[in-house]
Amino acid sequence: PFTFRDAGKIVGYDVDLAALMCSSLGVKPEFIDTQWSGVIPALYAGRFDVIMSSMSYRKERLEKVAFSIPYAEASQAMLIRADDASKIMSVKDLSGKVLGVKLGSPGEMMKPALEKEIVAAKGTGFSDVKIYDDHPSAYLALSQGTVDGVLNTLPTLGKVMKDRPGAYALVRPVGKLNWAGIAARKEDTEIVNWMDSELSKLKDSGEIYALQEKWFG
């Protein structure tokens, strides 16, 4: 629900929030669809001015970009089939099972640490890790039994469960509590200051929480 295509149009929480922020300037934001793996190089190449796509705070990213204050929770959780809820109660229970992740996502980056944790607890890690170009493909694989768990942000998976009641269950927490911010080039301090100011105003007015209720439930 952060950013996705609906009938070819880019929509979502990020889109609505960006529109609210830009309304104070009397302009409409332009959205450029970009491969996640190359999004930071594209930012510095000047293809766009900010990255607004549920980007979580990570050490390696903080070295490359400047972040706004948080605008959403970005902690990871794991989606499983509802029928497996009594058998998979933590990530460690995915020992000997198949994990699904999106290419270049925080979930993929967490895989080595999770594998190490599972091996330490159970003696055996994942039987396989399948990597998908997008999360909907991973959810479909979960429904079909190709994978046993899919990693994504907690707010996003909450929306997935809301849309298909009774089909899925959640395993959380996975890793540490984390937050998403809007990223800009390090030298663009004026943009970062503006983003922080707008986000603070929208938090104070409650508008940002109304958007979260709309998209995340």
Segments and roles (model prediction):
Residues E30-P41, S86, T124-L140, K176-N178:
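Short helix-initiation/N-cap motifs at beta->coil->alpha
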Residues G38, M55-E63, M110-E117, P136, ...:
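A ligand-binding cleft/hinge motif common to bilobed small-molecule-binding domains
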Residues T3-R5, A18-V27, G107-I131, M161-P165:
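Ligand-binding cleft/hinge of the Venus flytrap
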Residues A82-L99:
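Flexible hinge/capping segments at coil-to-helix
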Residues I32-S37, G46-R58, A74, R81-A82, ...:
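Beta->alpha turn/N-cap motifs
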Residues P1-S54, W194:
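Extracytoplasmic small-molecule ligand-binding "clamshell" domains
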Residues E73-I80, G107-M110, L154, G158-W215, G217:
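Periplasmic-binding protein-like
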